[in-house]
Amino acid sequence: MKTQTKKSNITSVLCMILFLNVTYPLFSQNAGLPASALFGRKYKVGDIYRYKLTMEELHDGKFDHTNIAICELKVIKDSLGIPYDEVRWISRKTINTKDTIDATKAALSVKPYLISLDPKGKLDIPKIEVPDMTEPIQDFNTFFVAVSPMVGATKLNIKGDSIINKEPVIADFSNGSFILKGEDCIAFSVKMTDITKNQVMILTTFFPPSKSCLSFLIPEMNTPVVPNTINNFQMVMPTGADKYMVQYGREYFYVNSTIQKSDGKIINATMFNQLNLKLKINCDKEYKNCQFEMPFSEQRNLRLEIL
């Protein structure tokens, strides 16, 4: 029984810090990249609109919870005349197997921040000052990154056009606190899957590269958690006095986006995110003599829709 409790606690901690804090600080800058005449974002100062972000999460294949958050965007210009969306979060709730938790207070506590799909703008993730809003803020940013100039989306012109990034991106998401060591290695591609009179459909895929760009913390990380796929994720968290949890494995995700040609707004989008890990619990400072090991998988199904 004690072991089960520890496993449950470890899983809960893990799920708080996964995903987009890993990859996207490296894709924050738009400046100097081309716009798209076909579906590039056309901003109108003063325009106000809202998005609903829904995320369903499964642990080891079983439903765990659903998060629903709503944000409001207002188009402004910065001091350089570059258009931005000012993002304000206005509500959030979590639905699990037992009850519904209202986290609107946390959503309203997030300071407004700016993001832009303009070629001269930025898509920086803001400093996270409200921990309960970490996931929706980062997920929302991902949907914008997936159709941005940084991944090459604005270079696509006709159905079937695609771009594959040949150089993997490595990100360090260590924070010196509850993430003592954290790295992720991702390659990505973007493809125009369809085009209609009024809309463009884009598929952006983030996946493990063919060769690792990580220096693994322990030799066994060279053995794939998922057969025939390199491990591209590693992380160390403290679990007690001179005790640590080591996690490693495979992460990938893809985003299907529908963009309105007239103004370049994302009308709706879906994201599938899968993480398959091996957890080593309560290890010593050399990450040996661990109390136990366990596999863990997390699947997240997300949907963004304009309101």
Which residues does each PLM region occupy?
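Bacterial Sec-dependent N-terminal signal peptides
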Residues: 1-35
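Signature of exported/secreted
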Residues: 29-307
